[in-house]
Amino acid sequence: MKSMLKTLLWVPALALTWSCAQISPQHATGSLGGTSWQLVKFQGGDDRVLIPDDKAKYTIAFGTDGQVSARIDCNRGRGGWRSEGRNQLQFGPLALTRAMCPPGSLHDHIVRQWAFVRSYVIKNDHLFLSLMADGGIFEFEPLPAK
């Protein structure tokens, strides 16, 4: 009876250990701090897809101190970010330079949507930022190593 009880206690412990080992440290902590990304596309809630002409013009870097820096086409900005729960994300106001970007730029669209980001998920090494009320999803990939 005692050996059966020990076995029953060890099986869940081993299962928990194995499942935790399958999650990378970044996913386990839920932290975006120290990561940098470039925009792949935006998929709107209405299935509209917007693809940047140059991914390198649309980047975001999450600092470990809760600061975020962004390049949004011809402008650069800084602001704050926080994640108060698993996969939750919220940006504070973004202080941006005010250059006029060329026609066809995704600048205005991204700036309008910035405050509506509410959650994120990292899947297949891509970062997906979801807007509130199914407004759309931004898909980012890691910045290439320099």
Predicted feature descriptions by range:
Residues 14-15:
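Short, linear, compositionally biased motifs with a strong N-terminal bias
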Residues 5, 9, 18-146:
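Lipid interaction determinants
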